[in-house]
Amino acid sequence: MGFNVIRLLRGSAVAVVLAPTVLLTMLSSAERGCPKGCRCEGKMVYCESQKLQEIPSSISAGCLGLSLRYNSLQKLKYNQFKGLNQLTWLYLDHNHISNIDENAFNGIRRLKELILSSNRISYFLNNTFRPVTNLRNLDLSYNQLHSLGSEQFRGLRKLLSLHLRSNSLRTIPVRIFQDCRNLELLDLGYNRIRSLARNVFAGMIRLKELHLEHNQFSKLNLALFPRLVSLQNLYMQWNKISVIGQTMSWTWSSLQRLDLSGNEIEAFSGPSVFQCVPNLQRLNLDSNKLTFIGQEILDSWISLNDISLAGNIWECSRNICSLVNWLKSFKGLRENTILCASPKELQGVNVIDAVKNYSICGKSTTTERFDLARALPKPTFKPKLPRPKHESKPPLPPTVGASEPSPETDVDTEHISFHKIIAGSVALFLSVLVILLVMYVSWKRYPASMKQLQQRSLMRRHRKKKRQSLKQMTPGTQEFYVDYKPTNTETSEMLLNGTGPCTYSKSGSRECEIPLSMNVSTFLAYDQPTISYCGVHHELLSHKTFETNAQEDTMESHLETELDLSTITSAGRIGDHKPQLA
């Protein structure tokens, strides 16, 4: 009994001694779990955007996820992650890493996701990824890789996705992916690859998606992919492919999408190019150099439900008819921007509308271009040129080699004339606009000058109207003569009193009476016949410039003086004739 009590006391003493030690260990572990400046969420540690140049050493050993992205790490040392044997994902993207030790990833066998994108890595040693055989996702994109080792991915049998996008790779070693039997996605886009060896993809029996876009391929041979029996999506857009062919004798039944947009494809090597892909559902051929597609190629597109053909140089002739008929019967998704690139008359017109409106497929090829030219709208304005006069010649007999003028030439001429008319109209409009602008600026800057110009313009208009009214009152210049047939009473009255009525007439005009004041001396001195009429001499002065109203009054007084002189002369001569009559 006493022995048991002593034993119990000893056990209690040991527990009391060990309790502080365990507590200190727990506290130190808690302090080590979340480094300074980092954010910890359970067993996930986020040390992002801290400008770190070294990986913190105080990370908990039980950490499951570590993010060190957007820092300034430059290299990964030997056993860099030793002690983090529970780590399952590691993000090291967007750093300055350029050197990775061959044993940097030792001790993290449970790692499933490794992100090393957007760094400065130019090469990897062959054994770099040997310690992380459980990787599912490996991202090496946006680096400076020039080449890959032949055993670069040796042992990565569980890898599902591999990203090598946006590097500087030129070649891919043969059988480099042989151990990646479970790989489903391979991204080799945005590199400088020109060609691929036949056995590059050997062993990749589960690959479903392959990216080869934005490389430098010039040919596409579907026989290069004989072992990709599970491939569903193949992306080869924006290369330099001009020829597509296939030399394989088996059917590629798994392929469902093929993207060949943005290449230089002009034609297909044979009618059986697409016969090896009977389950193809989506085909992208936009932005190439296709002018037409043959009927045999169209017949092989039996399974398509989505097609893209925009951005090609379609020639809207009879060769386009098979494609238009196929598009009309196609029930899947397609773009409506399939436009004609030639001939010039149809540039920018939808191919279906062109065939419908211009009857391209309804008539023979010999009259096709002629009918097309006649069907096109002609410009409304057509300049009429004067016809040169030629001497009449007998018609020449028709020759064998003579041909009628081409209607296409007439259409071109009318097209050019229409453009000239438009250009002239635009030039005239711009000229008027410039004149109005100058007038507006002058009016704003020199308002007094503009007022003076307006006043002068009004005065000129007033004078012009006055002269026109005088011209209307005054008939044209005619020959005037004095016709005087006095009676006996009038003659005696004029001789006795010195005054009498005098009548002159103007041919085709009117008559007026002029009172005369006989002055014999004036009559004797005036030896030329003077013809006076009612205001006619105003026309003789109409060419003179009347500056002011005072000048106009002066001219009117002169006219009255001349009228008096003419009247006296006529009266004197009438008196001279009287004795003769007597």
Curated annotation (Swiss-Prot):
- Tell me which InterPro entries the record gives: Leu-rich_rpt, Leu-rich_rpt_typical-subtyp, LRR_dom_sf, LRRNT, SLRP
Q: What is its main location?
A: membrane
GO BP, one example?
regulation of presynapse assembly
Q: Where is the LRRNT domain?
A: 33-58
Extracellular-facing ranges: 31-420
The organism's superkingdom is given as Eukaryota
Task: State the family it belongs to.
Answer: Belongs to the LRRTM family.
What residue stretches are annotated with the LRRCT domain?
312-363
| Coiled-coil regions, chain positions | none
Provide the leader sequence positions. 1-30
Q: Name one Pfam family in it.
A: LRR_8
User: Quick one: which gene encodes this?
Assistant: Lrrtm3
**Localization:** Cell membrane; Postsynaptic cell membrane
Q: What is this protein for, i.e. what is its function?
A: May play a role in the development and maintenance of the nervous system. Exhibits a limited synaptogenic activity in vitro, restricted to excitatory presynaptic differentiation.
Record-given protein name: Leucine-rich repeat transmembrane neuronal protein 3
Q: Which UniProt keywords apply?
A: Cell membrane, Glycoprotein, Leucine-rich repeat, Membrane, Postsynaptic cell membrane, Repeat, Signal, Synapse, Transmembrane, Transmembrane helix
Looking at the record, which segments are called Disordered?
378-411
User: Which residue ranges does the entry give as Cytoplasmic-facing topology?
Assistant: 442-582
Q: Does the keyword Cell division apply?
A: no
Q: Name one GO cellular component term.
A: extracellular space
What PANTHER family does the record point to? AGAP008170-PA, LEUCINE-RICH REPEAT TRANSMEMBRANE NEURONAL PROTEIN 2
The record describes its membrane topology as: Single-pass type I membrane protein
Identify the taxonomic lineage of the organism of origin: Eukaryota, Metazoa, Chordata, Craniata, Vertebrata
Q: Where are the LRR repeats?
A: 61-83, 84-107, 109-131, 132-155, 156-179, 181-203, 205-227, 229-251, 252-276, 277-300
Spans traversing the lipid bilayer: 421-441
Known glycosylation sites: N126, N357
